[in-house]
């Protein structure tokens, strides 16, 4: 469940504050900021297909999904910190920087959360235990979102000392460090006990199914 708490430190920060940060702190126009969010989600949707394929083929002594909780969270924290950093660049340079960092943030978020979300099925085959895991996850996800909502603006003011650029950068850095520690706690405190069914992932077949789906379009 602490993984959901850690995930929501990022997700709720993006949902609640990123658009405001882009327009009022970073200095982007609303249309440009909106296009960045849209393009990043499209790129992430394609990335998720290949990431799922890679996870299916992952075989390590730590399991299939747990290794991602070890190496990916620092990348996610770094991408979040970069996203909420205002570079000293020209207006066009800042737009390119915003595109690059937010796309990187979305890719790293998926790199952590897709394998994390798949873990309950590998931790236990008992439906009662899985239900309990879901309850813990929901509670801690809500708690993480509540912390972001309550603490972000006071932390921005306190850590920035009136400088909102520094305040957002420092606040996201602090949340990133906390999230890495929580994901590593999740890695250390879990063990994949359920062997996945042997199957050969067919990426081409899955892409054909998706492209033919009316829901996708």
What is each PLM-predicted segment?
Residues 1-217:
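Membrane-embedded alpha-helical bundles of multi-pass transporters/translocases
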């Amino acid at each position: 469940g602490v993984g959901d708490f850690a995930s929501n430190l990022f997700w709720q920060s993006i949902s609640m504050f990123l658009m405001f940060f882009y327009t009022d702190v970073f200095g982007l126009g609303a249309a440009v900021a909106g296009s960045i969010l849209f393009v990043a989600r499209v790129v992430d949707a394609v990335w998720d297909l290949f990431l799922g394929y890679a996870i299916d083929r992952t075989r390590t002594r730590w399991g299939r999904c747990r290794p991602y909780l070890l190496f990916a969270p620092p990348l996610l924290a770094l991408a979040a910190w970069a996203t909420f950093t205002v570079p000293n660049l020209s207006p066009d340079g800042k737009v390119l920087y915003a595109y690059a960092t937010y796309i990187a943030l979305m890719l790293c978020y998926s790199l952590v959360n897709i394998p994390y979300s798949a873990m309950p099925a590998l931790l236990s085959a008992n439906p009662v235990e899985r239900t309990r895991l879901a309850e813990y996850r929901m509670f801690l996800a809500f708690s993480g979102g509540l912390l972001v909502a309550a603490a972000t603006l006071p932390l921005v003011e306190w850590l920035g000392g009136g400088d909102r650029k520094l305040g957002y950068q420092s606040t996201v850095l602090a949340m990133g460090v906390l999230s890495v520690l929580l994901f590593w706690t999740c890695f250390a405190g879990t063990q994949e006990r359920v062997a996945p069914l042997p199957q050969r992932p067919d990426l081409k077949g899955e892409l054909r199914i998706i492209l033919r789906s009316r829901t996708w379009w």
